[in-house]
Amino acid sequence: MLGGIFSGWCGRRGRGRAYEPPDELRLRESLAVLNVILPAPLAAEDVMASAEAARRLARADTLARTYQACQRNLECLARHEASGDDGLDAVVAAHAANARRLADTCLAALMHLYLSVGAVDADTDDLVEQALRMTAESNVVMSDVAVLERTLGLARRRQPAPVRAAPAGLGLPVPAQPAPRATAARPAPPPPPEEAGEDEEGDRPEDDAAPLLPPRAPAKTRPPEKARRLAEACKM
């Protein structure tokens, strides 16, 4: 009781409210991890100047380490070659997509925190707290990542479907060609009349056959005077 009274008179704060600066080695290690991502490096003197800056540095350090871990996972997954196992390729593609989304979310939250340095912004603290809770869990739920993506304004990128490699000795399947459209056949134009007549005459068998009988001699005609006399004799 007396200790509390003396502390109030002397202006000392309680142990729970006292600020203990972090170790300088740990502080510089966090700065080294964070300055790799930030567009402008931070100095240790600027961070140690206030408790708020040190608190934000600790949060940014966690986000930066998670971002770098996701980048290493993406590098390892990028070395995977497509195999004949569809299940394995689908799992690798899903892990790569989730790691990319988590890395983008951490980087966006980190940039949001960096841009809000020097200003008291409750929304930024809420975003960073949510990102820290998400990355601290052993099993990251991608629905939480989707919420952060919508909050931070990140566009969802579609990953291409994994391409199954063709077995050795077999070529890729040839894509089916579209069937040609059926076109109505145009009727042939009729031949000219002269050519048609020639064709018909040439097709007759009697025109090509030679005559079997000799031609008849012309009949003899009597003179008109003899014919008249013969007619009068018949009348008598």
Curated annotation (Swiss-Prot):
S-palmitoyl cysteine lipid modification positions: C10
Compositional bias per record (Acidic residues), positions renumbered to this chain: 195-209
Post-translational note: Phosphorylated. Palmitoylation is necessary for Golgi localization.
Biased composition (Basic and acidic residues): 222-236
Organism of origin: Suid herpesvirus 1 (strain Kaplan) (SuHV-1)
Residues in coiled coil: none
Stretches for region Disordered: 156-236
The protein's assembly and partners: Oligomerizes. Interacts with UL7; this interaction mediates UL7 incorporation to virions.
Function: Plays several roles during the time course of infection, including egress of virus particles from the perinuclear space and secondary envelopment of cytoplasmic capsids that bud into specific trans-Golgi network (TGN)-derived membranes.
This protein's UniProt keywords: Host cytoplasm, Host Golgi apparatus, Lipoprotein, Palmitate, Phosphoprotein, Virion, Virion tegument
Record's GO cellular component terms: host cell Golgi apparatus; viral tegument
Name of the protein: Tegument protein UL51
Subcellular location, record wording: Virion tegument; Host cytoplasm; Host Golgi apparatus
Main location: virion
Biased composition (Low complexity): 160-186
Protein family (similarity comment): Belongs to the herpesviridae UL51 family.
Pfam families: Herpes_UL51
